[in-house]
Swiss-Prot record:
Similarity remark: Belongs to the QueC family.
Reaction it catalyzes: 7-carboxy-7-deazaguanine + NH4(+) + ATP = 7-cyano-7-deazaguanine + ADP + phosphate + H2O + H(+)
Free-text comment on the cofactor: Binds 1 zinc ion per subunit.
Entries under CDD domains matching the protein: QueC-like
PANTHER family: 7-CYANO-7-DEAZAGUANINE SYNTHASE
GO MF terms, alphabetically ordered: ATP binding; ligase activity, forming carbon-nitrogen bonds; zinc ion binding
A matching Pfam family: QueC
Entry's EC annotation: 6.3.4.20
Descriptive protein name: 7-cyano-7-deazaguanine synthase
Tagged with keyword Membrane: no
Encoding gene per record: queC
Amino acid sequence: MKRQSALVVFSGGQDSTTCLFWAMKHYEYVETVTFSYGQRHSQELEVAKEIAAEQGVKHHILDMSLLGQITENALTSDIAIETKDGEVPNTFVDGRNHLFLSFAAVLAKQRKIRDIVTGVCQTDFSGYPDCRDVFVKSLNVTLNLAMDYEFVIQTPLMWLDKAETWELADQLGKFDYVRQKTLTCYNGIRGTGCRQCPACHLRQAGLEKYLSQKGKN
């Protein structure tokens, strides 16, 4: 039986688009919310808008540009992407998932929606502390207390690696759509991306692993 309604935190990338299709399978009614936070690859706003329109779901865009005023990172500033052993990559935006989920919860309550779907993933979390299961569960409790509302934060990708996320898209019948239409690349290139940035490397490695495993079955 499908649950009633859900709000998907949506960027138009591989993970959130897979979550959108997951939500459309499991819920009667789905809305999406995208955040404009001064990201360098602003194309993601247009991609998210386009995908939401194609799938016939209501799409909200919230202005979170203040993030760019108080943080310095490779996603909102014109600095080179760096990954150092033992350190959080400089693509990490302090407070992003915390703020996004909190504002998504405010919107969800106004829309009379209890379930919030997010594509955060601990398996491939790249050292990002706000992608951990313990963080999401803690925030879920905090939001319920803060707004006296029974939210449920759904994380369908939490324990999946990138190959398994591709598998889920395939199981949902959306493999080609996700492969061709989504934008994961830090340099704003849709589909296969630039093949150079960390996001593209992770996406491509997962794709190759899944296709290899699928070929053996």
